[in-house]
Amino acid sequence: MAEITAQLVKQLRDKTGAGMMDCKKALQETGGEMEKAIDWLRQKGLASAGKKAGRLTAEGLVDSYIHTGGRIGVLVEVNCETDFVARNEAFRSLVQDIAKQIAACPNVEYVSIDEIPPATVEREKAIAMGSDALKGKPENVKEKIVQGKMDKTLRELCLLDQPFIRDQSITVEELIKQAIAQLGENVKVRRFVRFVMGEGIEKEEANLAEEVAAQIAAKEAPPAVVEAPVAETPEPAVAETPEAKPAATESKPAKSKSAKKKK
């Protein structure tokens, strides 16, 4: 097996236009033989993808995918160079596959590793450095272990590094490169958003044991005695005494004239 040097990888890249990592993998798969490596890249559809990678992609398609049950939804924008390709059924099928891929990857947050904010990288590094498994190890060993963990963790966040759901032998990035070779245009995933029903809403978790105990206690508790309100006896009404009127003076009957004459 020929030694796979940086110079050999560069030669293969110049001949095929494929990416550096693809060229290195092709040489590894073919024992370092240049012609076989070229054929390997052509079979994977990667031989001409690198030459188109820098072209402007101003056309494309925004597509959606709603997973069965309506609990997960995806919106994705994939760009290409011309409106003609944007209407192509192969391109539309690619965009739909990418949308389904995003729905199937709950950890994916970015398109590529270049989009990960430095603050996120530093946070992940701090977490890796604080691992108990690294205690007592030399610093140079720690750095290698942390770097390996970092690469794995960060790639899990990136769409292009995920194994394709329909063919685990290739990544999403390789799938796109195959599409570039097939369509003859540069293709790029620009952005996406993944929705999960109820995400971000805090739901109170009921403790079943406590709930059952509360129900039993409520049934066993004696009924509460409620005192009937005492009706207030109304005070008897006091009748008002009418004011006494002065007694009328009795007048003596007047004597008749006939009585006076008899005397």
Curated annotation (Swiss-Prot):
Residues 254-263 have a biased composition (Basic residues). InterPro entries: EF-Ts_dimer_sf, Transl_elong_EFTs/EF1B, Transl_elong_EFTs/EF1B_dimer, Transl_elong_Ts_CS, UBA-like_sf. Residues 221-263 are annotated as: Disordered. SUPFAM superfamilies: Elongation factor Ts (EF-Ts), dimerisation domain, UBA-like. One of its GO terms (molecular function) is translation elongation factor activity. Residues 221-251 have a biased composition (Low complexity). CDD domains: UBA_EF-Ts. Residues 82-85 are annotated as: Involved in Mg(2+) ion dislocation from EF-Tu. GO terms for cellular component: cytoplasm. HAMAP family: EF_Ts. PANTHER family: ELONGATION FACTOR TS (PTHR11741), ELONGATION FACTOR TS, MITOCHONDRIAL (PTHR11741:SF0). Associates with the EF-Tu.GDP complex and induces the exchange of GDP to GTP. It remains bound to the aminoacyl-tRNA.EF-Tu.GTP complex up to the GTP hydrolysis stage on the ribosome. This is Elongation factor Ts. It comes from Cyanothece sp. (strain PCC 7425 / ATCC 29141).
